[in-house]
């Protein structure tokens, strides 16, 4: 089956990388398209044998799956150019563009559509990817679930939850990076080298997520285990709350919707 990826910017490029690294081009004829020849050449330099084009319409022609990974304000002009049919599965990776808008753009009332929101970790097959569907068959749903399930974890949700979930998984990865950056900066100020602070921070995060993933504990339970009475950790936790850490995280998530 031919699979077209329209747009190879930050997210579209990450999707391409994830698929190529996973070897999915052994199962799909993947063609990447972008208006920027420079972006395509950068992709081609990494993956020389892959098909690329600056002609979006040519990329989408005869494709069973068309993944449109362009900025939300570019969805309308790009999709109108593709002239897709109801025989093609349309996958939109554009936050905030709902199914009603997509149907209006395509002019097709029964086209199988998926809204898919990954995060940039999809390039390393570690994405948390959100999927919702419209006018799709069981077979089409299984196909898309398997496709993105190979690139991390997936969560099937109704469209009504897409904005909230996007703020946690797709935007949230940037907030995690922000914490990592702050932790490394703190380590340097405290006398560690950047490399030492980076190692300590990343492994600590890995350990924390492993505990929660493997044992299903509530974060508060694990915090309590570390905070001994009169100890240094509870002092740090109290300082975080004094400085508005919890409120800042919640407000960032809400602002992202």
Residue ranges and their predicted role:
Residues 1-54, 58-61, 126, 188-190:
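NAD(P)+-binding Rossmann beta1-loop-alpha1 motif at the extreme N-terminus of oxidoreductases
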Residues 15, 19, 40-43, 78-82, ...:
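Hydrophobic packing residues within well-ordered alpha-helices of enzyme cores
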Residues 30, 40, 59, 193-200, ...:
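Small-residue helix-packing motif on alpha-helices
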Residues 31, 37, 56-131:
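Rossmann-like NAD(P)(H) cofactor-binding subdomain of soluble oxidoreductases
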Residues 101-112, 128-165, 176-214, 255:
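Internal alpha-helical scaffold of NAD(P)-dependent oxidoreductase catalytic cores
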Residues 113-114, 162-167, 219-224:
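Short pre-catalytic strand/loop immediately N-terminal to key active-site residues, enriched for Gly-Thr
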Residues 202-257:
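NAD(P)-dependent Rossmann-like dehydrogenase/reductase catalytic/cofactor-binding core
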